Amino acid sequence: MGIRTFRPYTPSTRHMTVSNFEELSRDENGKRPRPEKSLLQFIHRKKGRNNRGVITCRHRGGGHKRLYRIIDFRRDKRGIPATVKTIEYDPNRSARICLVEYEDGEKRYILAPRNLEVGATIMAGPDAPFELGNAMPLERIPLGTVVHNVELYPGRGGQIVRAAGAGAQVVAKEGKYVSLKLPSGEVRMIRGECYATIGQVGNVDHSNLSLGKAGRSRWLGRRPHVRGSVMNPVDHPHGGGEGKAPIGRSTPVTPWGKPTLGYKTRKRNKPSNKFIVRGRRRGGRRDKSGRAAQ
């Protein structure tokens, strides 16, 4: 992936950068192929609302119309080779996706690993060869390997390490568990029979892009994020005062009065604490209370 810059002929293009989409497939006329129609699905845009229409996630709404691409996160078609047909853009995620066709004719979308090319053959299963794009149990993957689309529970499908440029490294194996170093720096134990895909997720320069103007955020469905200190007291605890007044509290709070900006929200006795070898914020192993051991 390359990054395209612009001359500052308008204020928005001065700092704007976009992907040049050089990794995407094109036909003989230079046009990108249309997505596979059988794998498209309309999904109602939630706009940050729950089933009662109440805002549960602020600053969401609008954005360009999208069709959801059905992605195969489970990789449950085992032992059957598939050929990569196209590498496509997906408006619903930061990663690229690739269309694969199995020998029996079935087509599926999967996340496109970095450096995977059209025409490559991939496979999923415990006996799959150790090659880029193949999915296999963590217990079968050698130490030091970078993987993505990792399952947390066997058979549930990949739930972590799916964003553009993400990759987790296999660092240890102990009994029926495999330790992974996640992109956040956390080292976590996962059952060895959970599946993962070999390689790093493509589109690695996604984090280096600059939107350049507020309008591009609106295209993505992100509404303005207004600071509480510029609101009125009726709208936020930080609001009110003359000019740029301080918030008037010892610690920042949410619009509903709960502490924020550094306030710990993870339960100390959360059951999954025992699987975290090293936390992403503090070094050392977590004890039974959920705190990092000294």
From Swiss-Prot:
Biased composition (Basic and acidic residues): 23-37
Polar residues: bias regions: 10-22
Signal sequence bounds: none
Region (Disordered): 1-37, 228-294
Role, per record: One of the primary rRNA binding proteins. Required for association of the 30S and 50S subunits to form the 70S ribosome, for tRNA binding and peptide bond formation. It has been suggested to have peptidyltransferase activity; this is somewhat controversial. Makes several contacts with the 16S rRNA in the 70S ribosome.
Subunit structure: Part of the 50S ribosomal subunit. Forms a bridge to the 30S subunit in the 70S ribosome.
HAMAP family on file: Ribosomal_uL2_B
PANTHER family noted in UniProt: LARGE RIBOSOMAL SUBUNIT PROTEIN UL2M, RIBOSOMAL PROTEIN L2
Name the record gives this protein: Large ribosomal subunit protein uL2
